[in-house]
From Swiss-Prot:
Binds 1 dipyrromethane group covalently. One of its GO terms (molecular function) is hydroxymethylbilane synthase activity. The porphobilinogen subunits are added to the dipyrromethane group. The lineage of its organism: Bacteria, Bacillati, Bacillota, Bacilli, Bacillales. This is Porphobilinogen deaminase. Pfam families: Porphobil_deam (PF01379), Porphobil_deamC (PF03900).
Length: 309
């Protein structure tokens, strides 16, 4: 019986996601056993600066990918939104399980909704994507950076001067905390989710044919298609955590992909948004990127990068 070593970050959420996925694989009843190897990533260690200042995308996966390439582990369970648009040679996304709720969760100290927040209220987020879109809707708000895992951020909301914070609904759901803590779900029209938000990426080596066959059982075709369109868009714009960039695709009743793509200025005063519908994920992603580039997205990205240097 082959033992599959599964790499995971050490956070509660990462381990919850990893163990959930292993349970799904075990339920298939195939001759494999599993062991979790916990790995510390750069993103887990550097908590005193915003993600965008320390290298953005890839911060939570580089060390894990190194362990895959050196065969210390056989596969890894990641949050799709942490995945860089391009993977190292020899690695691939072996499967994309069914996506859960992609929306952002708004959590306020006193139960006020986003619209009800007092003028000048302090909103905690470490995401340029969230801050740009929410400042566009409420320019009166003050954004204050907040880092750390879910428990840390919820504690900071209680103990520090934040009036509200934003977290991914998916993470709270996976921890079983969504009903307790979420004040409201932010509609995708108000705050377009991050590329891949709510989805998991199971990464493995391209040449591990046995494992790829096993992972195929867990692949969700709709999630694979929609996330592929989002990631093509992200790659074309070379966007990471350093830029207010968002992309969320769904499948229509006719099986067409509908992608909403957005690039913004850091302060939210400019938001460029496009909706593209098509059947081919690659074409849809490229079309969305091209349309935004024609509107001036590249200039916004350059300005955002400059602002953070």
């Amino acid at each position: 019986m082959r033992k599959i070593i599964v790499g995971s970050r050490k956070s509660k959420l990462a381990l919850t996601q990893t163990n959930w996925f292993i349970d799904q694989l075990k339920a298939l009843g195939l001759p494999y056993e599993f062991e979790v190897k916990e790995i510390v990533t750069k993103g887990d260690v550097i908590l005193d600066v915003t993600l965008s200042k320390v290298g953005g995308k890839g911060l939570f996966v580089k060390e894990i990918e190194h362990a895959l390439l050196t065969k210390e582990i056989d596969m890894a369970v990641h949050s799709m939104k942490d995945m860089p648009a391009v993977l190292p040679e020899g690695l691939m996304i072996g499967c994309t399980p069914k996506r859960v709720d992609p929306r952002d969760a708004f959590i306020s100290k006193n139960g006020a909704s986003f619209k009800e927040l007092a003028e000048g209220a302090i909103l905690g987020t470490s995401s340029l994507r969230r801050s740009a879109q929410l400042l566009a809707a409420r320019p009166d708000l003050q954004v204050k950076w907040i880092r750390g895992n879910i428990d840390t951020r919820l504690r900071k909301l209680k103990e520090e001067d934040y009036d509200a914070i934003i977290l991914a609904t998916a993470g709270l759901q996976r921890m079983g905390w969504d009903n307790e803590v979420i004040t409201e779900h932010l509609d995708e029209t108000l705050c377009v989710p991050a590329v891949g938000q709510g989805a998991l990426a199971i990464e493995c080596r391209e040449d591990d044919k046995d494992l790829l066959q096993l992972l195929a059982h867990m692949n969700d075709g709709v999630t694979e298609k929609t996330v592929a369109a989002e990631r093509v868009f992200l790659h074309k714009l070379e966007g990471g955590c350093q830029v207010p960039i968002a992309g969320y695709a769904t499948l229509t009743e006719n099986d067409a992909i509908e992608l909403t793509a957005l690039v913004g200025s850091m302060d939210g005063s400019v938001l460029l948004k496009e909706k593209v519908v098509g059947t081919d994920p690659e074409k849809v992603g490229l079309e969305a990127a091209d349309r935004l580039i024609n509107q001036g997205a590249k200039e916004l990205i350059l300005a955002a990068n400059k602002e953070q240097q």
